Amino acid sequence: MLCLGALTSPAHAATAVTYFVSPSGSDSNPGTSADAPFRTLTKAQTAVRSIDKSTSGPITVMLAGGVYRLSKTLTFSSADSGGGTAGTVWWKAAAGQTPVVSGGVQVTGWSRTSADSSIWSAPAPSGLDTRQLYVNGVRAQRATGSLPVSVTQTATGYTTASGDPMAGWRNRSAIEFVYRGGLGLWTEPRCPVASVTGTAITMAQPCWNNSTRRVMRTDDSGRTYNLVGRKSITEAPTAVENAYELLDKPGEFYLDKTEHRFYYIPRSGQDLTTADVEAPSLDTLVATSGKASDEPSHIGFQGIQFSYANYTTSNTGTGFSEIQATYQVTGSTGYATQGLCTFVSGGTCPYGNWTKMPGALRFTYDSSIHFDHDYFVHLGAAGLDLGNGSQNDTVTACVFTDISGNGLDLGGVDIPQPGSAAQHTSGITVKDSHFYDTATEYHGGVAVDAGYIETSTIAHNQIDHVPYTAISIGWGGWPDKVRLPAQPNYSNNNTISYNLIHDHMSLLGDGGAVYTNGITGTSMSNGEKVVGNVVHDQLNTSGGHVLYTDNGATYVSILGNAVWNINVSPWGSKHVNYTAGDGTYDPTDIEGNYWPNGPSDYDNKKVLIKDNHAITGSAQVPSSIIAAGGIESQYRAILSWQPA
């Protein structure tokens, strides 16, 4: 029988319902007890949909530990919603257990390629394409090395002065060139090779054009500026990836898609005859219907690990022509038109609408979706995406790590001025969560990225050991480079407060702990608030600031933060407010911060800087500020969490 519990008064009792699921269960079971669980999440979803939520009591789907392998995306719609007497429908881990929702396939049958070789191989599922491999939960590195020959750039790629050794490599069209800093200090674009013939290297399209032919803009004084980043990659690649001939270090792998085999050199202590080797196969683990008319609401996920999602667009001719924060230029005319709106003839609108890297979990047009003590790990693109139309969602005490791109995406950049309130991303709370080792592959990614959002809070999180910016918020401010107004948008009343951020900016430049771009409100009262954050050990020396107000950042208040042990300025910088058009700066309020080498007091042209404190280290910061930064005490156990 169903797991029942009486609620409210006996005359109007609402029955609590619990369904049980286990990887060792059966979908022919009733699923109403831990002794007779369902086997699949889709069967549990069907059962939940059959309940009348208007009269039901609380509904729980209880997941036993183990791996739930998905062959297709688990999609939620209005039929899955809670509400009414049912409240929130919770999908949750059984006590003391960690269920893993996986988009991966196991790779078995490993053997040495020869008796004296360090390389092992195993068959890959036919048709599988992936950029990742995980051995006992440890991410392997695609075979990588340096470019083996000097090159000269051409319109279609490169030429070499003498014969190119890559011409003799197998599967040359699978080779990928990596350009750290190639389209700006904050970027790391990647383009595949199309062919290598003699001394000619032809690069794949449209990635090559999108990375070498970007439109420049001339302002009214005749000065030519880039809109975002550089016009073109001009240097030779800083690394070459994905060739069997580069497979030479423990922990590296290569997937030969022609012969359908993986090759791998084990790390010390790894035994491939017994190891759990996982290859991502499914791009999206969980998603919503994406329709405002079919909005899921009042659904929660608790104690679940989401892992082994795939992403292979970068393997195609599209490559990865990065703009910023893993947004990229795509399409055959992307370099000339995408997101450029009124800036160029034929430019597509709105301004700044570049292509977003998808999340392993993708939510749009939803409300009151809750993530509590969930774990986002071993993912091939972004982690969790709460996009357009996500409203009143919460992320509490979650862990984001070993993610190829951004950890958490909020909002988007494609609808700056929505036609309806349903399109707003609003009321999001991200708190007491741990982000570390994100952007492990696409190093220009950020731990938490927010585009256009409103009335949202990012508070009491810890972000550490990331290659670029920790938190990025806002978009569309770059037109001020050519003396034009920033993109109007609906962002307002967002707060970034009491976060602990350290050991960030380890690989790229021109970023910060908290980076803001574009208009954040309509006044100082409802503009962005950056309050009480504790930041130390920002690692870069090339450009950027710690609390960074970049192009068009308007109505930002930076109050009571603490910063130490840095190699760049703690705040920057003033920008002319071309939206106002009156010669003032973008309105900014900077007060009561503790930091080294901060700006002098200033009160002019709508920028106020006062009562800040020059320090040389943490000992000069009030203990109350340090104590308030980061994860609150009741949630700190997540700092010792380990993947299942």
For each predicted feature, which ranges?
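Secretory targeting and sorting signals
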Residues: 1-14
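The right-handed parallel beta-helix/beta-solenoid scaffold, focusing on the short coil/turn
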Residues: 17, 57-59, 66, 72, ...
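Extracellular polysaccharide-degrading/modifying enzymes targeting complex plant/algal/animal polysaccharides
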Residues: 20-365, 370, 416-420
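Extracellular beta-strand solenoid repeats
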Residues: 62, 69, 75, 90-92, ...
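Short glycine/acidic-rich loop motifs that flank beta-strands on beta-rich extracellular proteins
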Residues: 72-73, 283, 310-316, 358, ...
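Extracellular beta-rich repeat passengers
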Residues: 141, 145-147, 308-312, 539-643
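Right-handed parallel beta-helix
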Residues: 297-308, 347-349, 367-381, 390-405, ...
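Active-site-proximal loop/turn and secondary-structure-junction residues that shape catalytic pockets
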Residues: 390, 414, 454, 475-477, ...
